[in-house]
């Protein structure tokens, strides 16, 4: 074969290979286009499960442990449209308290990523209940948990997570920078109140649906503070109480009316011989009832009730079953402050039913241990110490702490009344235990008109942790 023939032969072979390659590329493009068309046609699949509409997009591997679901729209039997929480229902009749949640945060935090917290509380919208809490900007069993016994620091923040879940960086939502806080839902959005700053000039930052709407400056320049539990929304307006002034003497107490995050009215209570801190508030037939902590001189709890115009009445729970800690043995009550063991105190709550009252309190008279609910059928107005029933929820040998009220509106429960509920903080660590940190978990209960049980639901963590050794 002469050189020209070789050149022609090699060129022909190259041309054939090129044509074959081109055909393969065209086939590949056609195949990809057909495959993409099929996937696009089947990308959205809508299924009905018990009248709940669930839309899945992208790939779902049902027969494997890993499920990749993104861009998911779930409507599970709840109307997600906004409503106005009326707050005009009366409290549901109840016979006792059923366990609602327990997060086991400290137990889980010995090995998992769980926030160091205190002052947890629960608040519900018409769609869900969330646990709010004040973090210390640190995780359990980590070096930054050292010294978290301190109440006020620039690292503290109000965050929230689904009720019953341990508060971690993976399930929690930032709400506000705060070392004192409150939050509530009016049916259209979340109002959060976060207080931060120096003791002599702290500022409360109000947010509505995450956007700053108002600020309130400390007016007495002596540790402005608020409820550490939920505020109350009635017919589109939300209400909260703040305190500014001494913790062991007369201070200043203000009620604020807030609409969509903006203060529309406020009044200062005329209470020269009373002390109101860390109030636990709830709606009842369009009014607001708050039961508070007297840290000055009362071992029974002060209360204030007000309407939407902020016209108020005030007093102390009269019962000889005393609700604060420390406190004397049950005995003769008073409709004013009971001065015996009246100094200091702990956040707590009660629910009024006519002349009767459900009193939540520690089981110990002198330390934050144990927790019980007591029904005194005449305790709101009478001073004797007789009561009808008692339900134990934390044993006296186990640690408790703050407690507070929250309600579930008819728009959430479907009932025709306001369901009363409460939470209990289970404090662990310093100053009572040999750790470098202070944190806690929480339990909660809701009132039911059916059978309940006495038991103890303690924190249950085994201390010290690795970081403490």
From Swiss-Prot:
Example GO biological process: viral budding from plasma membrane
Gene3D superfamilies membership: 2.120.10.10
SUPFAM superfamilies associated with the record: Sialidases
Disulfide bonds: 92-417, 124-129, 184-231, 233-238, 279-292, 281-290, 318-335, 421-446
UniProt-annotated glycosylation sites, renumbered to this chain: 44, 50, 58, 63, 68, 88, 146, 235, 365
Keyword Disulfide bond: yes
Membrane topology category: Single-pass type II membrane protein
UniProt region (Head of neuraminidase), positions on chain: 91-469
Regulation: Inhibited by the neuraminidase inhibitors zanamivir (Relenza) and oseltamivir (Tamiflu). These drugs interfere with the release of progeny virus from infected cells and are effective against all influenza strains. Resistance to neuraminidase inhibitors is quite rare.
Record protein name field: Neuraminidase
Gene name in the database record: NA
